From Swiss-Prot:
The keyword Iron does not apply. Belongs to the protamine P1 family. One of its GO terms (molecular function) is DNA binding. InterPro entries: Protamine_P1. The lineage of its organism: Eukaryota, Metazoa, Chordata, Craniata, Vertebrata. It comes from Osphranter rufus. It is found in: Nucleus; Chromosome. Protamines substitute for histones in the chromatin of sperm during the haploid phase of spermatogenesis. They compact sperm DNA into a highly condensed, stable and inactive complex. GO terms for biological process: chromosome condensation; sperm DNA condensation. This is Sperm protamine P1. The keyword Nucleus applies. One of its GO terms (cellular component) is nucleus. Residues 1-60 are annotated as: Disordered. Testis.
Length: 60
């Protein structure tokens, strides 16, 4: 039982960290939304920018 309790506390700390990172990403997204919107639309039509955009998203 002790072992289970330990793992549970560990997961909770991890979740907290992830949540903080997510909020930061959201704020950044809001900042670049206006600028990125025009570019993303043009890139999607071409098709080559789509791969690049996904990679950038993953890094965040």
């Amino acid at each position: 039982m002790a072992r289970y309790r330990h793992s549970r506390s560990r997961s909770r700390s991890r979740y907290r960290r992830r949540r903080r990172r997510r909020s930061r990403y959201r704020s950044q997204r809001r900042r670049y939304r206006g600028r990125r919107r025009r570019r993303s639309r043009r890139g999607r039509r071409r098709g080559y920018s789509r791969r690049r955009y996904s990679r950038r998203r993953r890094r965040y």
